Amino acid sequence: MERDEWLRAAWRVTVAEKVDPQRLVFVDEMGANTSLSVLHAWSHTGKRAYCSVPRNRGKNTTLLASMSVEGMGPTLAVEGATDREVFEAYVEEAPSLRSGQIVVMDNLTTHKGERVRELIEERGCELLYLPPYSPDLNPIEEAFSKIKGILRKAEGRSREALIEAMGRALDAITPQDAQSFFRHCGYLSLGQPLCPSLWSTTYRGLVLLAE
């Protein structure tokens, strides 16, 4: 499947420009491992900058998360990759959805399935899928970029250290960051008023899923 510019344009017109951004909740996942290191460094003029990078990447840790204009929502860390069963458990147990919200996901296979839709609609919410290959329309991708930058600097070389760094990185995503990400992706206009009562973040810590 390729990027469809018509679908992207239709999304901007029917969702990004029409839907109240306070109704939108983006759900996605990102991966990290113990080999993450900084990509850039400063050095004296004429000198190369060096750093050590582990040869062993270690087992991947997947972070399932949601984000609204309020900030990061409930998050779940899973050792290894996720499957549909894990994703359905996250949707059922973790997100603090409110009736009337619209849950937005990309087209990853694990995000699709009738059970996922049922769980969301049971809470009085609607489910929408982004146009294919459109990370630029997904504000949580920008949050993940900031989180990965923090993880690279943290250089957690054990799973415990990586998880701890993930918690700090999630804490660093403020409601103001979230609103900036929404604005950059076209869902929020500069100066657009938001209800003050919704400005408190729903993030309440990182939940770990045991093997």
List PLM regions with ranges.
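Short functional hotspots at interaction and active-site rims
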Residues: M1-E211
